[in-house]
Every structure is written in C-alpha cells, then in structure tokens.
Amino acid sequence: MTVPIPTSTEQSSAPTRFFIPDTLANWPWPRALNPAYEQCKADSAAWCEKYKAFSPKAQKAFNLCDFNLLASLAYAHLPEDVNRVGCDLMNLFFVVDEHSDAMDKNSVHVWVEIIMDALRNPTKPRPDDEPIVGEISRTFWENAIKCLGPTSQKRFIETFETYLYAVIVQADDRDHHVFRDVDSYMVVRRDTIGAKPSFALLEHNMDLPDDVFNHPLLEDLRTWCIDMLILGNDLCSYNVEQSRGDDGHNIVKLVMLQENIDLHGAMQYISDMHDDLADKFLRNYKNMPSWGQPIDEWVTRYIEGLGNWVRANDAWSFESWRYFKYDGLRIQKERWVELLPPANKEDLTSSSE
C-alpha cells in the first residue's frame, strides 16, 4: 500500500507522528479467538505469576500485555488443552525475552543451558539455587507433552533450542553495538521471533514426515509467514523501542540506516516488502503436491495455521497494551501514531513493556 506523506510542516522538521501501513488489508484470514481464551488466560496467568519472575510493578505491565490473547488468537481453532500450552509458551517466551534483553551474551548462554536441560528432563527436580526460568521451563514442558504428539514434541525441542541460541546472538550484537544490514538481520530475527517453535503446536496431532515438512514450497511458506510476522511486529514495536533507545534490533531503524531514508520512507519500504511476501504466500499456498491422506489434510491445516498466525499477530499488536497501551484500537483504525519522546530512566527500570 502507499503510505500517506506527512504534512509539509512535519517534513521540514523532526517528525512528530508516523503512519503504520495496513499490511493485512487484503489478508483472507479473519480474526478468530479460541472460545477457551478466558479460562486458559486465567490458568496460564496463575501458573506464570506464581514463579514471581518480575517485580510487582513489572508483573502488572506484563499482564496488561496479555500474551494469552496472542496465543488464543494464534491457536483459535485448536483444542483447549493445546491452547493452554500455547498460552504458557507465549508467557515463557516473554519471560526469556524480557530478562535476556538486560543480559550480556555469557549470562544468556547460562540461561539457555538451564532451559534446554529443563525441557529435556521435565521430571527432574531443578536445583534450589537455579534461576527460576529453569522451573518455569520444566513445568511448561511437563504439561505440554500431555497433549503434543511425538513429532510435534521433536520439532518443538529442535526449534526452541534454535530460538534460544539466536537470543545469544542478539545479546552479542547488543554487547558490541552491532547494527546489522536488513538481510543479515532477517536471518537472525527469523529465529529470535520464536515463530518456529510456536508453529510446532499446530502439529499437535499430526505426524508430518520430514520430507513433507521440509518440502521446498512448505519451507518457503513458513519463511514468508515468519517474515510477515517480523515486519508486522517491528512496525508496531518501533515507537516504544525508539523511545527506549532499543531499536537496534528493529527493521525500521535498520532500513533507515541502510537505505539512508527517513521514517516515512522506511514505512513505505517495509510496506512494499510485506506486500511482496503476502503476494508470494497467497499465490502459492494452494499449490502443494499431494502425498495422499491423511498427510494432505495435515498439510492443509498446517498452512491454514500459518495464515491465521499472521492475522493473530497483527490483531494482538493493536488489542494488547504492549505497544500502544490504551490507544491500540484507534491506531488500528486510523494508523497514525504519535512519536514517543525518549523514555526516562525510571520508565526503563520499573516496567517490562
């Protein structure tokens, strides 16, 4: 889509607002919400809060972000027990993300080893002196394996480990003040966004053979979906991140630097990128070869799940408090966003926005 040009006054001085393109105006998957959302939210929130991973003030901000809503939008058509696992997973992701954002590379690596040991040994008690993320991870997986089939479990463990090691790379970039070019950023971000383990839940009752799962077209569809999630996430998170001086791992900032363009130009550039990805996905998602039943039905459901994930991420970005606080629904409709001023030190240390 064409991004509206700011007024002449805004162009001649520092911008005070920007326009978020409606990248999903023609996306065929409608918003849907799992009917078990409220129950899963209550249960998952109680599970997560009992570990006291955040200060009371940060926990309040964390709850307002409602990561259970994200899961219930993304897994709208899955059974309640799988949706509950999805809620727990989103909460686990953001416990890891929020804490690792303040860690150096070596500290993140320690966490990664703890988390993976907990996932591989869900019945083994965790050491008393270990960071609480170990027990959070253990109990998450202890519950998840009750409703995820063997193939789903295998893919989850493999891709969650890949996600964690990408978080180490992100921490290393942060330690060394690295600003990546767009292509290398996308390579790392495809793993740090956590989409691949999230997609493993779509396979909860499937047994897709590796040759089907790794078919080049299905690989492409997965990558195009992930890239749309990245662009959509970074468009919505940019304002908060630039105000915190934490936009070095956001494609908006990287496009501005790489292409030497302003914020408006970056929004248009990213909108065009997203349009290209959506076009490729929609032109190809019905062109998978046939392997016979039940594989064809599994592949169809899996791809439908990918398409729904794109809509879910967009809907949550505006309905949640995380990026726009109480102004999300207006911004979703009107698309104009007021640029936030630099956050003060108290804002950065007292909440986990």
UniProtKB/Swiss-Prot annotation:
GO biological process: isoprenoid biosynthetic process
Entry binding sites for (2E,6E)-farnesyl diphosphate: R322, Y323
Top-level division of the source organism's lineage: Eukaryota
InterPro entries: Isoprenoid_synthase_dom_sf (IPR008949), Terpene_cyclase-like_2 (IPR034686)
Sites where the protein binds Mg(2+) 3: N233, S237, E241
GO molecular function: metal ion binding; terpene synthase activity
A Pfam family assignment: Terpene_syn_C_2
Known cofactor(s): Mg(2+)
Binding site for Mg(2+) 1: D97
Site (Plays a critical role in the stabilization of intermediate cation): F94
EC numbers: 4.2.3.135
Enzyme class, first EC level, given as a word: lyase
Extent of the signal sequence: none
Catalytic activity: (2E,6E)-farnesyl diphosphate = Delta(6)-protoilludene + diphosphate
Keywords: Lyase, Magnesium, Metal-binding
Motif (DDXXD motif) on chain: 97-101
Binding site for Mg(2+) 2: D97
Magnesium as UniProt keyword: yes
PANTHER family assigned to the protein according to its UniProt record, in alphabetical order: BETA-PINACENE SYNTHASE-RELATED, TERPENE SYNTHASE
Membership in a protein family: Belongs to the terpene synthase family.
Described function: Terpene cyclase that catalyzes the cyclization of farnesyl diphosphate (FPP) to delta(6)-protoilludene.
Domain comment, as recorded: The DDXXD motif is important for the catalytic activity, presumably through binding to Mg(2+).
Designated name of the protein: Delta(6)-protoilludene synthase K435DRAFT_659367
Species of provenance: Dendrothele bispora (strain CBS 962.96)
Lineage: Eukaryota, Fungi, Dikarya, Basidiomycota, Agaricomycotina
